[in-house]
Amino acid sequence: MRPAVEADGAVGAGVDPARAPTVPIRPLRFRELLDEPFALIQAHIRALAALGACVLVLAVAVVLAVTGVVSHLTDGSDAGTAWAVVLATAVCLWSLRLVLRGATVAMALADFEGVGLGAGAALRRAAKHAGPLLLAQVMFSLTGIGVLVVGSLLIITYPLALIWLAHVRARRFVTEPVIIGEHAEFGAAVARSKHLVDGANWTIGGLWLTQRVIFTVLAVPLFGIPFYLSDFSGTHRWAVITLLVSGLLLVVTVSEIVEATSRAICYIDRRCAREGMDIRVPGDSR
């Protein structure tokens, strides 16, 4: 069995925490896997809100700056402005997810140690594993695009593609927690994730699909915020661009924080189920 605690950031039984973890270290039922991420988020709401707000504001500012430059260079061309918005938003969205996923996982894993990390400390801990996390995000994106493109060749096969994607996502669901918690490189982390998830592929796949439904429901009120503000800002081009980009990135920010927290919780759950990490051995000094 692997040691329950690593030198910098891993988690497990045998730790004498300064405070009890927000989520109990034991195997969890499906309902708990859905509910506990929100409990963990609530326990660190200030740090996560600060992290999300800073990343969101920076991403929106970059999109608007790039769009403004392109619009100026193309003399306000509608096509040029539209492409600038789409491409800049896509790049910032991808980068936002990378940063939030790493920092949120680091913060969640620290909670299991009884440590409360602030936004800055979580970013620094994630930055130590920037290479593997970046590679994991690249493969995450390519896998999703590949599966959905193949599945969408025929409209009737699209639901099957979503199920296939859920299975693929489940096998790699705890890759980022392994990278941060066990200081693993990308290849070793993927193999470790598949080992931990083995036997619970469809449970975690179902969790992933259920979260897509939850995120869709959450998107309605979140998108309502910029549309409400449009009553005051008007419908000028830049006001509309700002509100639409802000609304989209806000939805992604909230969704990514929830999903990243779920990844950390599933990592602990699977280590308990597969390795008995929640079992204390008398006289064990780990």
Residue ranges of each PLM-predicted region?
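Hydrophobic alpha-helical membrane segments
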Residues: M1-R286
